[in-house]
């Protein structure tokens, strides 16, 4: 996502728009929580996925769309501006996100399930909440399309990692964990919460660097990242274009799943391909739809040959929270956790 002011008040203002240039339009901004007022320049334009969305004033009533949307709003320092959240698949966040959310009141949590029922929010409710922005991955179609939101005075903004699934021909690099703190800085500039966003982004960068440093000391092992989505026996995996791949890279794990595989586009994976690859390590993500490690292991053990793989034989089966699969601070936390667990084995 790139940002730019949509007007030029003066030459110097244009050059410093996102660094705190004050303009007459900024005087009309809405205040929200400890992050406002400020001297950021509005209106701005956010560019993402080939779209361009005008943000007329400092967002004060934000709806978090999907796990990525909610987590990034928190990381950008704007949790106190959320009026509602939806589409989160029912799993808890890690401490950095969950603790912040629990400290706040008044955020409407729209019920959402897992599996095919991703959970949504009615457009009528969006209007009732008087939202001025919906940010996140769970939008882009129907009433929640970028154009329809804009026609109703609501800025619909998506993180760049959502582009591939929302717009034909768009691409997203999920494995690039460095893009996570970079986007938080951009989001902080858009929401005028730059100080907190930059501090959180710097902490993420330090944690990621530490994970890579420690991970570089580990032996290279073959691994597969797996998960179950619902009560069926359909098994899903993480290919090369996933945050799990970025986590694997930090931990010196070689992904045995075909690089081109993407669960969103290809559906369930053949369990036999995992067995044949004989991974040294199995990473199992849990949490969404109420899926537990015990439940996942029970299903995996029914797959012919799975218990004979090196991962089962050597008891190298590691659980990560489902949040690890999303390009948020939780993926960076998971990288550190995985490196730590591998070092202990």
Tell where the protein language model's regions lie, with residue ranges.
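Extracytoplasmic ligand-binding site segments that recognize negatively charged/polar headgroups
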Residues: 91-96, 142-146, 154-186, 219-246, ...
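Proline-aspartate-enriched helix->loop->beta-strand connector
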Residues: 123-136, 271-284
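Alpha-helical, coiled-coil/dimerization segments enriched in small aliphatic residues
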Residues: 116, 237-266
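Bacterial Sec-exported substrate-binding components of ABC uptake systems
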Residues: 2-75, 189-226, 286, 343-345
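Short helix-initiation/N-cap motifs at beta->coil->alpha
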Residues: 48-49, 107-122, 162, 261-271
């Amino acid at each position: 996502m790139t940002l730019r002011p949509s007007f030029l008040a003066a030459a110097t203002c244009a050059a410093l728009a996102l660094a705190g240039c004050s303009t007459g339009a900024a005087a009309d901004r809405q205040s929200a929580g400890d992050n406002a007022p400020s001297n950021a320049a509005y209106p701005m334009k956010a560019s993402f996925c080939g779209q361009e969305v005008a943000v007329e004033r400092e967002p004060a009533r934000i709806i978090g769309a999907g796990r990525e949307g909610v987590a990034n709003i928190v990381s950008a320092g704007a949790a106190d501006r959320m009026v509602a959240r939806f589409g989160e698949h029912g799993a808890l966040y890690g401490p950095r996100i969950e603790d912040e959310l629990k400290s706040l009141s008044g955020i409407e949590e729209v019920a959402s399930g897992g599996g095919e029922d991703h959970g949504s929010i009615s457009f009528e409710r969006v209007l009732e909440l008087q939202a001025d922005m919906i940010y996140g991955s769970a939008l882009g179609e129907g009433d929640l399309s970028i154009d329809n939101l804009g026609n109703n005075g609501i800025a619909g903004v998506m993180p760049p990692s959502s582009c591939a699934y929302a717009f034909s021909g768009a691409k997203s690099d999920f494995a690039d964990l460095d893009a996570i703190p970079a986007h938080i800085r951009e989001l902080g500039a858009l929401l005028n919460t730059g100080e907190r966003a930059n501090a959180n982004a710097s902490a993420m960068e330090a944690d990621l660097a530490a994970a890579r440093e420690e991970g570089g000391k580990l032996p290279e092992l073959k691994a597969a990242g797996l998960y179950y989505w619902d009560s069926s026996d359909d098994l899903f995996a993480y290919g090369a274009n996933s945050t799990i791949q970025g986590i694997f890279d930090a931990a010196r794990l070689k992904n045995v799943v075909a690089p081109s595989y993407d669960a969103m586009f290809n559906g369930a994976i053949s369990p036999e391909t995992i067995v044949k690859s004989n991974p040294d390590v199995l990473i199992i993500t849990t949490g969404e739809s109420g899926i537990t490690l015990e439940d996942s292991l029970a299903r995996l053990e029914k797959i012919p040959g799975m218990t004979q793989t090196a991962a089962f034989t050597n008891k190298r089966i590691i659980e990560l929270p489902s949040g690890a699969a999303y390009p948020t601070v939780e993926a960076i936390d998971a990288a550190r956790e995985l490196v730590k667990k591998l070092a202990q084995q």
